[in-house]
């Protein structure tokens, strides 16, 4: 039975883990790292790079290197946060055909789900390489505060990557699952998750294998990327002050600033000051310009203080919704790379009144929890019950544009709720059901998830028809809605597809594209491997001919040299079959050379044996006689 992998699909980095027996293993990628950059690049020769390979070339290819795309997933192009993000990244964020925020590289438009799918594909490949078998099922994590559109888009990404997504699980819940597995102590735990692009906080009760989420809150546009952007802004301002040149309009310079900002941020978690030195950052008529700026930890903290303070609002809301106080929290778990920043740790400690737990790896704990959940779903881990919640209230628009809630936030899922509504006008024969998610009182201020029509209502005065609307949220937090006219029993049911979102046709097209690319990638890798082995074979054959000298039969030597020439010619092309045939031909010729040398050696040795024995006797005699001669001389 194939394994279920757990994937933490992060904004900045991603991680994959698998449950093996009683242990959960974080799997290293092909570069030997336990996390993989969530980056995808498209090169000028049409190659697609994912992970570390994409990150390595980002500085020289900024417009076609896509990162932090998770922040766009499930969002509309007109969303103010998307417009803000457009100003901060060197690649193009464009309007998709469906009105969603998409990205563009090399003239092609891509849905964020598609880019996420390439990252998920890399994680799938990493797991398959380690396990030695095909992987088809996964549990994928999302920020707890993701809405339905963002969850659907993440599930779509899994499908495009060729994965059956068994469960979408909230990141803080996954962390608590990894932390709480095997613990028999009961207690209230807060998970503070500040990652690359999103912030979540969840309050959970852990007791005897039951992990129950009491509340969750967060901000899906707050994370390490924002901290980096503050440093980038500071560096650009300092350079403009010093040189009078604004680097913000230079994509190449912006990408170098981005890398330097990330590096400086990490260094300042362990040192008090760092120097950012970027030679030849730009040039003007007077010549090249260099950026050299010192950044202290204190300065960094002042630049990002408001961002850190922004995390406390959701913390207050979460403990209020969970009906606990900060000092009733027994343990605080830190998740996400940003929680390594000393100021963040200090702020969390002050808020909750206790030191956070130090026994979890903030970069890996979410993937570990996802792998555990995969094992739970497969029945490999028993005595664990996970009770999660819906992060946002769900409801419909009613008369006057009011948002009428059917399911309140922090309701345990899966759940189902029905409510009866009526018509607003006499003889109304159809109603439009508009489904929203959010906490504002007016529907228009919340996130429109989708809408549908219930037709064929029997003519009646306003207020008489009985229309039952039912909301059903599954364990992934994905919403289904139905509406039924009680008089006629006519029912209309939809699985909510975001007002934008990907259609089934879009997903199928992207799946086919991913499969085609996978075949092309496989062929490309096969060609590279064959090139390497053929070049090695040419070298070995030439070495055998040289070392064999006269022992190589002339016919074999001539055949091998012709095969070498043919192989060299095939190496200059791109045809896999031609190279394969040339390589096989050279292999046969090389074997003949080897056999010829071996047989010639055997023949020479067999023919010269008596003479050899005679020679040996002479050598021994000569030695003996020399010694005797010496003794006679003395």
Curated annotation (Swiss-Prot):
Residues 619-634 have a biased composition (Acidic residues). GO terms for molecular function: ATP binding; ATP-dependent protein folding chaperone; unfolded protein binding. Induction: By stress conditions e.g. heat shock. The modification Phosphothreonine is found at residue 198. Coiled coil: none annotated. SUPFAM superfamilies: Actin-like ATPase domain, Heat shock protein 70kD (HSP70), peptide-binding domain. The keyword Transferase does not apply. The keyword Magnesium does not apply. Keywords: ATP-binding, Chaperone, Nucleotide-binding, Phosphoprotein, Stress response. Residues 601-610 have a biased composition (Low complexity). Residues 601-634 are annotated as: Disordered. PANTHER family: HEAT SHOCK PROTEIN 70KDA (PTHR19375). Acts as a chaperone. Belongs to the heat shock protein 70 family. This is Chaperone protein DnaK. It comes from Gluconobacter oxydans (strain 621H).
